[in-house]
């Protein structure tokens, strides 16, 4: 595990619930006001098990995200920090892909946090 792995940077927030040679599945839980340390995710699918609001920050850019329970979103590989800026706990599952991206990454700044595609 690398030093920027979320289970290393924030072991009280991230927990591995399944892993094999192709994917790793993380459970994430936090409370209002909680912040993560800088960490890295590979390409992933996030499934929200609770509604939440959070701020995602990458370098000098940040975005506020509000999601409902039961949503599934793609998250391209990125290093970031996150903060629960809402008034509810966050509960989500990340399915991290271990296989390399099949196509080149599009030019420009990648989206922050989860996207619909």
Task: Put a short name on every predicted segment.
Residues 24-40, 57-59, 76:
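Conserved short histidine dyad/triad with adjacent acidic residue
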Residues 21, 60-78:
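Short acidic-glycine-tyrosine-enriched beta hairpin
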Residues 103-117:
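Extracytoplasmic/periplasmic copper-protein system
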Residues 51, 77-100:
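Ligand-binding loop in jelly-roll beta-barrel domains
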Residues 8, 13-18, 102-103:
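Local beta-strand/beta-hairpin segments that build beta-sheet-rich folds
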């Amino acid at each position: 595990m690398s030093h920027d792995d979320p289970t290393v940077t924030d072991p009280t927030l991230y927990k591995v619930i399944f892993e094999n040679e192709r994917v790793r599945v993380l459970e994430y839980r936090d409370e209002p006001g909680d912040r993560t340390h800088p960490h890295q995710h590979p390409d992933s699918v996030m499934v929200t098990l609770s509604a939440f609001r959070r701020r995602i920050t990458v370098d000098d850019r940040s975005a506020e995200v509000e999601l409902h329970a039961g949503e599934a979103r793609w998250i391209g590989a990125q290093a970031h920090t996150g903060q629960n800026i809402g008034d509810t706990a966050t509960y989500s599952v990340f399915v991290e892909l271990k296989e390399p991206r099949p196509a080149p990454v599009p030019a420009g700044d990648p989206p922050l946090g989860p996207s619909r595609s």
